């Protein structure tokens, strides 16, 4: 993705002389572009700020918004550049992060929530009463206490590692049934 210039896809190699050219690239989504993840079937996942996740058809460029909705009992907070990971054990599976881990077994058509809030949910960092949860900075666009990285295991299908922007490192060995916070337990890191 490119700041203020959308999400683009392009080849890693070409057959014509001169290497990869500007015309080899194609814009697939607008906004502040982030991840573009291929599905393998002529579609990609593309996202812009605030976790606005889309599934895009590369032939028609038609896009479908697939961001998980908030369950009745919880407000979701998405990072400016939300966590996105393809399931290495299921080609249709997709993990997505807010302050919770979400999983779709069918390319974003439906979602299940695999975790509680895995962040500190620190009111001082959230400042809900004064800012609605936005961290006041020059952009006025940053949510805090959000998941930044999701790493599903390639060899243990039920294992997940999750990192948050407020210092948590969460691990689940049972696909989100239980979570252990490893923050402060890694040698050489705060």
Model-derived regions: residue spans:
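Beta-propeller blade termini and top-face loops
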Residues: 1-190
């Amino acid at each position: 993705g490119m700041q203020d210039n959308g999400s683009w896809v392009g080849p890693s190699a070409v057959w014509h002389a001169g290497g990869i050219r500007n015309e080899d690239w194609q814009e697939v989504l607008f906004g502040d572009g982030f991840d573009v993840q291929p599905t393998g079937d002529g579609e990609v996942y593309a996202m812009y700020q605030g976790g606005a996740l889309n599934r895009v058809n590369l032939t028609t460029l038609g896009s479908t918004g697939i961001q998980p909705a908030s369950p009745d009992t919880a407000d979701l907070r998405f990072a400016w550049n939300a966590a996105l990971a393809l399931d290495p054990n299921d080609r249709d599976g997709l993990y997505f992060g807010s302050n919770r881990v979400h999983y779709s077994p069918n390319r974003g058509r439906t979602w299940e929530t695999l975790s509680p809030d895995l962040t500190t949910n620190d009111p001082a960092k959230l400042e809900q009463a004064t800012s609605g949860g936005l961290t006041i900075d020059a952009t006025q666009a940053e949510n805090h206490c959000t998941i930044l990285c999701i790493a599903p295991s390639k060899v243990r299908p039920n294992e997940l590692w999750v990192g948050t922007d407020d210092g948590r490192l969460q691990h689940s060995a049972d696909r989100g049934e239980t979570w252990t916070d490893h923050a402060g337990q890694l040698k050489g890191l705060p």
